[in-house]
Amino acid sequence: MRVLVQRVSSAAVTVEGAVVGAIRPDAQGLLAFVGVTHSDDRDKARRLAEKLWKLRILADERSASDVGAPILVVSQFTLYADTAKGRRPSWNAAAPAAVAEPLVTEFAAALQGLGADVQTGVFGANMQVELVNDGPVTVLLEL
């Protein structure tokens, strides 16, 4: 499982013209793109959620748990792109939707269980993601 996390001052996910999840402007938070591979399980999802919740990448070396920062979770199978051969990425390392969707849901639920204010995109949808990257700070978490 991979989580590409960006510190943001605002972010929004839109599906079919409607905003489905957002971090309001000037409310420093985290945008977490979540990719799932075949060997991932619920335990990995929970451990990565805890790692993200306590990751000290906000202002003054604080974590989302320290300041109650909002987290926007967006599924992102392309985090498992293989570009080693040719010019067209392979997605073979990405888990199929039947495996990935429950694990992305588990990841978001684990964050909520830790006390996070979590919003999400829509799994499998064509999403438009807008964000203002703060710093910029972008970190790849992987288990």
Curated annotation (Swiss-Prot):
It comes from the Bacteria. It catalyses: glycyl-tRNA(Ala) + H2O = tRNA(Ala) + glycine + H(+); a D-aminoacyl-tRNA + H2O = a tRNA + a D-alpha-amino acid + H(+). It comes from Mycobacterium avium (strain 104). Homodimer. GO terms for cellular component: cytoplasm. GO terms for biological process: D-amino acid catabolic process. Keywords: Cytoplasm, Hydrolase, RNA-binding, tRNA-binding. This is D-aminoacyl-tRNA deacylase. It holds the Pfam family Tyr_Deacylase. Its EC number is 3.1.1.96. Belongs to the DTD family. A motif (Gly-cisPro motif, important for rejection of L-amino acids) lies at residues 135-136. One of its GO terms (molecular function) is Gly-tRNA(Ala) deacylase activity. It is found in: Cytoplasm.
